[in-house]
Amino acid sequence: MKLQKSATRQHKEHLYELFAQISSALANPHRLELIDLLIQAPHTVDELAALAEMSVANTSQHLQCLKRARLVICQREGQSIVYSLADPLIARLWIELRRVAQNQLVEVEQVMDQYRNHRHEFEKISSSEVNAGLQIDQILLIDARPEDEYKAGHLPGAISFPVDTIARRIHELPMGKTVVTYCRGPVCVDADEASILLSAYGYPVKRLEDGVGEWQQAGFALERPNDKR
């Protein structure tokens, strides 16, 4: 005989069902990548499709799933629909999920070494060390992400230097300081590639593993172009 659940029990199970809506929306590698990209800046569907190397149709479907779970929001700008994270806590959720995976799954480090095969070639520096170095003007901070992501928010004092611009703009960088590169975070190779190029030009280079999401989670503020006006 099936026992009838009390109203209290039904409400409790309903709560867990609602919590599971969030985990279900995140239980897809493509949607996790979209979250990671939206931490950097708001993007259109076409932009996200290009960055994630997916079709526009598939990207749109994944975004709709995230939207139903209220993890992303969208608004129309001209002819485009622009997506962004619904709450800063979502960035923190992704960062902590990634850290749990790194702690619990030995395969993460193995695959990370295959993906970022230069990641052990440069000295690591923490967000706290970067913040301290900026206060006494000891480091030159290079943002290796695309310029639109830099404009959406970057580490204080950082210079926008996308990897594909380094060769033609290297003369803009002063010598005499330690260069620190960063990009979207640990699951991104842009800062590694920038470090290789800058090192070849004779600059002492360190790599910040954190991106803008981790920087904010550490308690530090971002800077935007309008902040300097």
Predicted regions and their residues:
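Short beta-strand "wing" residues that participate in macromolecule-binding interfaces
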Residues: C74, L222-E223
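Amphipathic alpha-helical dimerization/coiled-coil segments
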Residues: M1-L18, R92-D137, D143, P225
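N-terminal helix-turn-helix DNA-binding core of bacterial DNA-binding proteins
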Residues: L18-A57, I81-P88
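Positively charged, proline/Ser/Thr-rich regional signature most characteristic
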Residues: E129-E193, P225
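Beta-hairpin "wing" of winged helix-turn-helix
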Residues: K67-E77, S84
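The C-terminal cap of the DNA-recognition helix in HTH/winged-HTH DNA-binding domains
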Residues: K67-R68, K151, Q217
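Catalytic cysteine-centered active loop of the rhodanese-like fold, especially the PTP/DSP P-loop
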Residues: L71, L173-Q216
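Short, hydrophobic-biased segments on the C-terminal half of alpha helices
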Residues: L63-Q64, V212
